Structures are given as structure tokens and as C-alpha cells.
Amino acid sequence: MGSKGVYQYHWQSHNVKHSGVDDMVLLSKITENSIVENLKKRYMDDYIFTYIGSVLISVNPFKQMPYFGEKEIEMYQGAAQYENPPHIYALADNMYRNMIIDRENQCVIISGESGAGKTVAAKYIMSYISRVSGGGTKVQHVKDIILQSNPLLEAFGNAKTVRNNNSSRFGKYFEIQFSPGGEPDGGKISNFLLEKSRVVMRNPGERSFHIFYQLIEGASAEQKHSLGITSMDYYYYLSLSGSYKVDDIDDRREFQETLHAMNVIGIFAEEQTLVLQIVAGILHLGNISFKEVGNYAAVESEEFLAFPAYLLGINQDRLKEKLTSRQMDSKWGGKSESIHVTLNVEQACYTRDALAKALHARVFDFLVDSINKAMEKDHEEYNIGVLDIYGFEIFQKNGFEQFCINFVNEKLQQIFIELTLKAEQEEYVQEGIRWTPIEYFNNKIVCDLIENKVNPPGIMSILDDVCATMHAVGEGADQTLLQKLQMQIGSHEHFNSWNQGFIIHHYAGKVSYDMDGFCERNRDVLFMDLIELMQSSELPFIKSLFPENLQADKKGRPTTAGSKIKKQANDLVSTLMKCTPHYIRCIKPNETKKPRDWEESRVKHQVEYLGLKENIRVRRAGYAYRRIFQKFLQRYAILTKATWPSWQGEEKQGVLHLLQSVNMDSDQFQLGRSKVFIKAPESLFLLEEMRERKYDGYARVIQKSWRKFVARKKYVQMREEASDLLLNKKERRRNSINRNFIGDYIGMEEHPELQQFVGKREKIDFADTVTKYDRRFKGVKRDLLLTPKCLYLIGREKVKQGPDKGLVKEVLKRKIEIERILSVSLSTMQDDIFILHEQEYDSLLESVFKTEFLSLLAKRYEEKTQKQLPLKFSNTLELKLKKENWGPWSAGGSRQVQFHQGFGDLAVLKPSNKVLQVSIGPGLPKNSRPTRRNTTQNTGYSSGTQNANYPVRAAPPPPGYHQNGVIRNQYVPYPHAPGSQRSNQKSLYTSMARPPLPRQQSTSSDRVSQTPESLDFLKVPDQGAAGVRRQTTSRPPPAGGRPKPQPKPKPQVPQCKALYAYDAQDTDELSFNANDIIDIIKEDPSGWWTGRLRGKQGLFPNNYVTKI
């Protein structure tokens, strides 16, 4: 049922172009190539979503798509999946309704490799559920927390990698908890394996967590002073990888979003200040370097100790002591004693980095706990879980973190394989349908290789064993691990070793892991000395982040990072198994992160390892389409009189009647207990074709008539209102009197740098690039914007100083409030010049769309002043100048514009001293009105007159040519200047005096920024043993030996090549880009030819093209 209680068939909402198939179950040929080709067709037409049954495939567009607004939310709310094109909102709505109706917990598993768009998909699901669910003030508060948790956790947990500019470096399972009525009244976040090592080291070309760069870019002057914030390259930790800026990330703006998120979640201002204090403290901690003195470590420059000690509220000397030495407990003969051990340079650097990593991890845990406390509820009822976890990834050097990340992805792949197959199997059994199981690669063998406890032990068990037996030994542990792996699992088909590590044949391809640091990172133990140091802080907040009981914690073996992630992964699997699962399979189309860039081999590789072909086969399993009887009857009821408008009888018999009415063979369908199953896509297309024949004719007649009526009424009214302003007062131009009004001739949606000058909620009535003449009558380009309140003139200037020096940026040249306009002056001739008279000074402008502009200005003027806009018509116009205090043109003064009868439709301008002479030929008579021509477009040949097919206007001049002989400046967008930043942070909570910020040390050899030696790891990975397994379980495609029929030869038609880009000025025209090839259908002496481009037929100016 629709939202208003009236059933709407899904064809009613398909007012969109179709590209490929929406559901790949309906592909006539199931091969990896056909799947890739279908995804490519849809991707190139900006359809990023495709179904495989109930599974949603999402291809990352690397740009903002237009179909995520209020209109789409309303369209998908309460609608069945097949009623609208594939969309993530359909899946989110299905989850939400199933939870309410079935009273079952739901979850969505979002999987895909790094950079495939998983985090964005999770955001859309949470925002949709937040939007469609009801509730009062408390519920709205929970919704706000749910939405604001994303920017906060992204700031502290996301980073730029070589594969993804906003890569999640932690896993997150977000449970949105609901009341029985469906209102979100609570929530819970479980986070997994934050990649804290990113704080102190990362691959070349990557960044640390976003918050460090946000703080440096967005902090106020007061914050920068108190936190010791300076340039990014001052901090050793940030300079490691040589990457500071990201093209599509505005760190300054996102810093404000992070602060706002902390406010919404309820983190006190004092705690916010301390969180930022720790972030800055980590940066300053990294600047402490060490030198070797007698084989031991000493701080190279002690002045670098002062600021981190100050920010963390600890004693400077104690910090120095704990970084260069360690207390070790020793037992001998039943007695224990503490030994003071001095560290070497390598150990001191490790200790410093361990403290920095621990501080960031503890702050991250504090933020997660704060979010959970803000959403906590007494008891759980129903929930929807959203799993957004790090994607499968391969880097130049893959360490322990990548090993854990890829293990979790193996577990998720296993869930997908088992649950989709299990759910499909159960449906056939319940409906009494026979089916043949589909073979597939089960990656359980890889999961067991990693996590098995015994017989044989898995990699994680061997790793924990080595860490336990060599707990006090740092050197040689990694090589011992490698030797044990070779000895115990070296013969495993999904495992290989090499001199510095090992290789796992994952489901997504072979990954080579470097053993360096494996054991140390798995131990993940923070030295007691560092905990004692942080517990000595005079800041209670920092103390609270280290709550360990040091005496109690000395007993027992500490839990390793590997065992933690293994337990978290298995707990996650158990949680997901208790929910009704939904799936989003994200695909990354390229490594360039650019829209419309399609790497065929990369996509095909993902299609293969995600098992999409097997998924389609399982879904079809002999029957490509299935639908419950009621829905099937509703959809195809129009096919027979007996079923329309409703079937009177048993639903199953009604379905059988419909199938027999289209003469479908009995072996092409089967009726289950509650559903009809149709075998081949062609049989379904037969039903669709029959239905279309019934509806199509009626729909076209209604649509055509209605559009014709509305368009004619709208355009006639607009043209006549505009024409009345000039009627009997000014000659009209032949090429504009009958044109349609567009309003936006700049494309404001694509130019946010212009929107910054307009109020947030101001509607832009008119936008055009016009010519503005100065006191010397020299023409310059200005963007003219008209809103209900103001008129704006925007120009461009080079920045002369500051960080943006030399860049050309938009500048607001003039802003006139509508009510301050005194009058508008025009000539009586057909020119496009007019003068805006304002109290201070006038503006002399020229616009080919002057009539449209003046009609809109007149409306807004009347709304504001309750008076009509004064329009003055004369062939001698007075121009009042702006007062200046420089040069020979000082003072205000005036100028005069005189109009004379000339020749042709193009105005000729001749400035002379203080007078501008304008000559132009005669136009249409002053009493001319727009003709009431048909607004519907005729795209074929017509036997009528030329005027029926061609506009009454001259073909436009090619780009670069101005009608007055002046070269036009091309419109070039530039990034807007960054706005000012606010700060509401309080002062630091420490009794220490702020130390001076030490000068940056000269870069030593171990601090040189790295550059990637090779980008081979970005190539499609070797599929390994998993790929071989997939090939052996694949069945041959049907009719594999038959050659394809030869395509029909295309008809030969004359063609032309576009010399310049052209934007259609009317609804019957073609838009095209330079170098486009256009089929010529008809040439006309008027200069307007008829052509066809990309399936669309229309008029275009012949002076913009050349024949080929």
C-alpha cells in the first residue's frame, strides 16, 4: 500500500531511464563478464545500486549522487523492493519494516575492500532509519547522537590510506535499539581493533588519524597558543609519511563538525578541551628524540620534554626517566625484587611510541563509552545492527594489523556464504520446490588456517604460543614464529612462506605479510612504568583513562591482541547469527578515486571473489523469479478481465489463471505453498511485455496530454508577463522573444563557491554571467545572482597575500537589497543593455536574458515594496558613477549611453570620452508578443512549415565571440576561501605554566619522509589457491560453444564533429561537448540543423560543428 492508503504499482514510479537490469538474477547469461558488463552500464549511467535478489550491490561512484534527498526517502518509505529502482533506502526500509512486523532483530552486513564505500553506505542507512522513524524529544536526541557519532568516530578512527581517503581504521557494529512502536530510543556501539600503530608509523603517502590534521587546521588562535599548535611538518609523527592534505577533505570545517558532535553527545566542554590537549600532547610526544650515550639512550634535546609534560599534566623529569629506563620485576629463590634497566635508543623510541599509541587508543575508547552512555537504555527490545568494518586490504608492506583486518573479512565472507545458501535452501524446502545445490568456494578452510586451536593449530594459536614462551625476549621472536609456521602448517595449500614472512591465499587474493613486529604487536602490553607515569598526572581526566590496578594486574598472562580480535570476531558472528541478515556488497571500480573511471580487471576480480556469480545461481536455483501469490496478482491483474480489478477466488488459482492466459509452458513455472516460481527470465519478460502493452498506450496518452497542457500554460504565462514589461516600449530580438525561461544559466548546483555569497535559505531565482561596464566602458565578466532579497554581482580576483597568494578566487563586488533599487533604464531598441539605478551609484550591465531577469526582478520588487518597478525607456541614458579618490577619474560624476539606428542584430559599442555610442539594427516592432507555439517537441520530420520545426532565432555565435566584438571570459570555478573559525574551548586544566615551544630540530636520517618505492600492490592481486578453487567449482556457461550472431550493420548517415561545447537554451535543442560526434538528420538554411546524439534528437547550431 502507498503512504496514502492507495496501492501503487511499481511501474508508476519508474519514470526513469533503464540501464542494464535492476536485478542480476534476470540476466539471460550468468558469467563474470555479463555481471561486470551490467554493473558497468549502470555505473556509467550513474546507477550505483543493483540487486541480486535481496542482496544489494553498491559501486562506489566517487562523487555525490543526487538521489539521496527527501523525495527519495518518501518514495522508498513503505514501498516494496520491486516498486522502485534499486536503492540502499529500499534495503533500509525493508529492515525497519521487518523488525516492526516480524518482531525480529535485523542486521546489515556491509562488505567490500578498502575504499569501496562501506562507511558511506552505513551513514545512509542510519540517516534513513533516523528520518522515517517517529518519536518525541527524547527519541530525537537519540537520533541526533546516532547521526553525530559518525563524524566524531571518523575523526579519531579514520585516516587517508593509499587506497582510500577516508578509510576506517577500526571496526564498528552499531546497534540501534527501538521501542515496540519502532522509535529509536537507545543504541550501542561495539568497536574492534583500532589501528593505533597509525599514530606512530604508516605507509608512505598516507596520513595519521584525521583529528591531528583537523586540530592544526581548525584550532582558534587561543587554542593554538595554549596547545602549542604550529605547522604540520613541525611534528615528527605527521612528517613520517609526507602527506598532509587530502583533496576532498576540508580539515578546518570537519574540526568544527567534530566539536559539534562532542556537544551533541554530551561531552562536557572541560572534557573536550582535555581530549584536544591529549591529541596535541601525542604530537609533541613524537618530537622527543634520542641519542646514544655509552650504549644507552638519552634525550637528544630536553626542551622537547616540556610541552608534552605540560599538556599531560606530568612531571618533566619523570617523563624523561620513564622514556629512557624501565623497572623490571625479578624473582629468585621465592624473593622478588625490582631492577632499574636503562634502555637503548631503539627501546626508548619504542617506549615513546607505545605511550603515544596508548593515549590515542584510550581517548578513542572514552569517546565510544561516552556515545554508549548517552544512548543507554534499561532493557533491550528490538534492534537493527549496522556492521561497518574495515575492508579487505593489501599494501606494499602488510603487517599484523592487515592480518587481523583480513581475518575479520574472511569471517564475514563465511557468514555471507553460509547464510545466503541456508536461507535459500530453507525457502525451497518450505515451499516444496526441488532444487540442485550450487557448488561454491567455501572459505572456511582459510578461517581454520588462521584461527584453529589444534590439529593443526592455526596461525593465531602458534603466534600466541611464541609470544608466551618468549615473553621477555624481543629480538628473534618473529623469526622463531616464522620457523614454527613453516614447520606446522607449511604444507597447507592456502599458506606459503618467504624469507621475511608468509603468504595467505585469502578469498580475495594472495597477501604477503611481513613478520617484522608481529609478536610485539600481538603482545600489545603497555609497560607498568608508563601506566604509573600517567596515573601520576595532576589531571583527573587523564588519570581516569588509566584505571589499572597495578598490583592485581601483575598476576596471570595478559590477553594478546590476536586472541582479542579472534574472540571479538566470533562474538560478532554469534550476534549476527541471531539477527535476520541483509547484505550490501560494495565494489570499488578503480584505484584513482575518480568518478566514471572503470577498471575492468579490478571489478571482475571483486565479482569473482565476492561470489556474485554463485550468488545469482543460488538465487535462481532453477527459478529466477519468485513472488507471493498476492503480490503477483496485484502486479499482473491487468492481463485478464477475470483478475482486474481483483480476483474473486483462491489466490493460487488466480495466479494459475494468469500464467495460462499468456500461454506460459507448464515446465516454466511451479506453484509452491505461498509463492509462484518462474524458471527463466524470458518467461518473466513475457509477462512484463504483456503488462506493458496494456499500460503503455494509456500511460503515454495521459502523460503526453498532461505535460503538454502544463508546459504550454507555464511558458505562455511567463513569456507574456515578461513581454508586458516591454510592450510598446522596446523593440524585441528575434532570437529571444519566443524562448523558454530557464532561470539558472550558470548551473549553481555545480558551483558552491558562488552559493557561499547567498544566504543559506535564499532561493536563487536567476543566475547568469553578464557583462558589466566600468567608467571607461570597459567590459568585465560578472556573475549576476537574483534572490527574493538581494541582487549579487560576483567577480574574480587574484589573492595578493596570505596562504592563497596567486590563486584566483570569487569576490563579492556588489550586493544590492531589492528595496534599494530606484529604477531600471533601457533603450527603445533591441539591444541587451540596461542600467540598474541605486541610491549610491548605478551599474551598467548587458545580458542576453535581460527580459527574463527584469520580469523576475519586477516580481520581487513588488513583493518587497508593494510598488511596481520603475522602468525607464530612452535612447539617451544617464549613468551615475561610484565616487573614487584616485587618478584623473576621481570623484563620482556621470556618464551617458546614447543609442543610434545601425545595421544587424549585433550591437556595436564605441566609447568616446564620457559617452558610450551604441548602434544596432532594427528589431521586431515594439508591439511584438511571443507566439503561442506548441511547447511539445517534434523530433521527427514534419510536413508543416519551417517554423513548426525550427526556432525563430538566429544560430548563436561560437564561444569566444562577443556580440559587441569583445572577447568573452570563460567561466572558471575556483575553490571558495575558507571561512573564519570559532572556538568555545576553555583554558588548560593544569597548574603548570605554559612552556615555550622549542624550534623544530633539523631532520635526522631516521626522520626523512618516505616515498613509495613501488605501487605494484595497487594492482589486482593474484587470486591464489582460492581463485583456483573458484575456477574448479564453476560450471561451464550454457551454449558455450555457439558463436554470437553478427550485429546488424549501422545505417550510414552524415555526421559532424562539435568544435565547441553547447548548452541547450530551449527544450527542443541538443546539448553537447567539444569533440562529440553528432548524426546529421536534416540540414536547414536557418543555421539550425536537426541531429541525434546519445539517443536524443534535437536542434543544434551548425556554426558550432564541422562535417566529417
Curated annotation (Swiss-Prot):
Residues 581-591 are annotated as: Actin-binding. The lineage of its organism: Eukaryota, Metazoa, Chordata, Craniata, Vertebrata. One of its GO terms (biological process) is post-embryonic hemopoiesis. Residues 933-949, 999-1013 have a biased composition (Polar residues). Interacts with CALM and F-actin. Interacts (via SH3 domain) with SYNJ1, DNM1 and DNM2. Interacts with ARL14EP. Interacts with CARMIL1. This is Unconventional myosin-Ie. Residues 695-724 form the IQ domain. It comes from Homo sapiens (Human). The keyword ATP-binding applies. Coiled coil: none annotated. It is found in: Cytoplasm; Cytoplasm, Cytoskeleton; Cytoplasmic vesicle; Cytoplasmic vesicle, Clathrin-coated vesicle. Residues 730-922 form the TH1 domain. Residues 19-692 form the Myosin motor domain. Belongs to the TRAFAC class myosin-kinesin ATPase superfamily. Myosin family. ATP binds at G112, E113, S114, G115, A116, G117, K118, T119. Residues 919-966, 993-1053 are annotated as: Disordered.
